[in-house]
Amino acid sequence: MMLFGKISQQLCGVKKLPWSCDSRYFWGWLNAVFNKVDYDRIRDVGPDRAASEWLLRCGAMVRYHGQERWQKDYNHLPTGPLDKYKIQAIDATDSCIMSIGFDHMEGLEHVEKIRLCKCHYIEDDCLLRLSQLENLQKTILEMEIISCGNITDKGIIALLHLRNLKYLLLSDLPGVREKENLVQAFKTALPSLELKLQLK
């Protein structure tokens, strides 16, 4: 509550800013709130439920192991035993996930596919964090990164740590400039990877 009080004081103290600037500040703050990691919540409900809540709160979708249907409504998250619903796939298209929220993924053990499309807050740090998580290094088989303007070669090269990656699509990433070097690095480190590049 004190945090909200401090932020609201800051917002009230800012005067005569253009509406668009004020609005941008507010939405940036709100997105940061949505991404904040609550470690007590992870402990209480388990990593898959807490990560599901985070992802859906930010506008992403999840699919659970053994299910065909994508879960996209925060208010209709399934209930039941904590170990019943394990995240198998994440579609973060048009979501506001950002690096401060990626600690939610630490305990996930069944994620096989991640799609990051038009994620304006995704940066290299997100991919670096993702590739450092030992569970995800083992389980991720497919990734798609599309139209994420803040991603550069540094973030993409970190994906070499995903040692079981079988399919990687990179599309419309203006910050990725060393295509030939990336192709060579992936061929060397992950020879069975199907790498699809749709880059300028």
UniProtKB/Swiss-Prot annotation:
<keyword id="KW-0496">Mitochondrion</keyword>
<comment type="function">
    <text>Involved in regulation of mitochondrial membrane ATP synthase. Necessary for H(+) conduction of ATP synthase. Facilitates energy-driven catalysis of ATP synthesis by blocking a proton leak through an alternative proton exit pathway.</text>
</comment>
<feature type="repeat" description="LRR 3">
    <location>
        <begin position="117"/>
        <end position="141"/>
    </location>
</feature>
<keyword id="KW-0406">Ion transport</keyword>
<keyword id="KW-0460">Magnesium</keyword>
<feature type="transit peptide" description="Mitochondrion">
    <location>
        <begin position="1"/>
        <end position="25"/>
    </location>
</feature>
<keyword id="KW-0433">Leucine-rich repeat</keyword>
<keyword id="KW-0813">Transport</keyword>
<dbReference type="GO" id="GO:0046872">
    <property type="term" value="F:metal ion binding"/>
</dbReference>
<keyword id="KW-0479">Metal-binding</keyword>
<comment type="similarity">
    <text>Belongs to the ATP synthase subunit s family.</text>
</comment>
<feature type="repeat" description="LRR 4">
    <location>
        <begin position="142"/>
        <end position="173"/>
    </location>
</feature>
<dbReference type="GO" id="GO:0005743">
    <property type="term" value="C:mitochondrial inner membrane"/>
</dbReference>
<keyword id="KW-0375">Hydrogen ion transport</keyword>
<feature type="binding site">
    <location>
        <position position="59"/>
    </location>
    <ligand>
        <name>Mg(2+)</name>
    </ligand>
</feature>
<dbReference type="GO" id="GO:0006754">
    <property type="term" value="P:ATP biosynthetic process"/>
</dbReference>
<keyword id="KW-0472">Membrane</keyword>
<keyword id="KW-0138">CF(0)</keyword>
<feature type="repeat" description="LRR 2">
    <location>
        <begin position="88"/>
        <end position="116"/>
    </location>
</feature>
<feature type="repeat" description="LRR 1">
    <location>
        <begin position="62"/>
        <end position="87"/>
    </location>
</feature>
<keyword id="KW-0809">Transit peptide</keyword>
<dbReference type="InterPro" id="IPR032675">
    <property type="entry name" value="LRR_dom_sf"/>
</dbReference>
<protein>
    <recommendedName>
        <fullName>ATP synthase subunit s, mitochondrial</fullName>
    </recommendedName>
</protein>
<dbReference type="GO" id="GO:1902600">
    <property type="term" value="P:proton transmembrane transport"/>
</dbReference>
<feature type="region of interest" description="N-terminal domain">
    <location>
        <begin position="1"/>
        <end position="61"/>
    </location>
</feature>
<keyword id="KW-0677">Repeat</keyword>
<dbReference type="GO" id="GO:0045259">
    <property type="term" value="C:proton-transporting ATP synthase complex"/>
</dbReference>
<feature type="binding site">
    <location>
        <position position="93"/>
    </location>
    <ligand>
        <name>Mg(2+)</name>
    </ligand>
</feature>
<comment type="subunit">
    <text>Homotetramer. Associates with ATP synthase.</text>
</comment>
<keyword id="KW-0999">Mitochondrion inner membrane</keyword>
<keyword id="KW-0066">ATP synthesis</keyword>
